[in-house]
Amino acid sequence: MKIRAQVENREGVHRVTLSTNQNVHAIDIPPKSSGFGSSANGGELLFLALATCYCNDVYREADRVGITVESVEVEVEGEFGGVGEPARNVRYRARVVARGTSEEEIRRLLQHTDTVAEVQNTLRGGVAVRLERVDVEVRG
C-alpha cells in the first residue's frame, strides 16, 4: 500500500490531497485566519491519524473475527512542548458499541487492535523521517 499526503498553501488557500494506491481524495481544512498556513496544526493531525487508524482497524479486526461493531469513538490526547520537541504523554481512549458478543470479547478485540494499528506501531517504532528534496523559487 503506497500512501501520499500533499499540502498546497498560499495566502488564503489551503489544499490537502490524500492518496492510497490509486484512490485519491481531498479533505477540507481551511487556512489559518491570518491567511498563511493550516488552521489545523501538525500535532492535531498526528493525533487525528492515530484516532483514525485505530477506528478503522477496529472495524477491520472485528470483521476478521465475526464481530458486528455498530460504532467507534476514539479520542487521542498528548502534549507538545517548545519548538522542535516531540510529543509526550500520548494516550488514547476508545468506546465501541457492538452486537451479539460479550464485553470480554470486545475488550480482547480492542487490545488486539492496539497491537496491530499501523500508525500506532509506526510511532512506537520510531521510524526514520528524512527531508528528501527542496525546490526553491525566488521572485522579484
Give, region by region, the residue ranges found by the protein language model.
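Extended beta-strand/beta-hairpin segments
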Residues: 1-48, 56-140
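Alpha-helical metal-binding/catalytic segments enriched in His/Glu/Asp
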Residues: 53
